[in-house]
Amino acid sequence: MKYIGLISDTHGVFDEPFREFLAPVDELWHAGDFGGGLELAKEIAAFKPLLGVAGNCDNYDLRYEHPLTRFFECEGMKVLMTHVGGYPGKYDCRARQLIDELKPDIFVC
């Protein structure tokens, strides 16, 4: 079983306390707003394998490498990840459409 570290809204900060806390995880999922551009994403990816999406504060270079939404499978579970998706009962229109279409087991936002 994979041990996943779920982070978001780092806004340019990924320093030692984060690294210590996340050291045991197998993989990191970043739900957007990396901040610091592609360089921060590369720094995080050098620390642990990374799957991420761009947030509303992320620049074009980062968005080129990390899409606004990501749909993938992890250990037999379908995962949909986006930065801003709303919450149960009040999902963003775009998120609701993707949830209805893709039927993920896990929705990360």
Located regions from the model:
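Extended, loop-rich substrate-binding clefts of extracytoplasmic carbohydrate-active enzymes
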Residues: 54
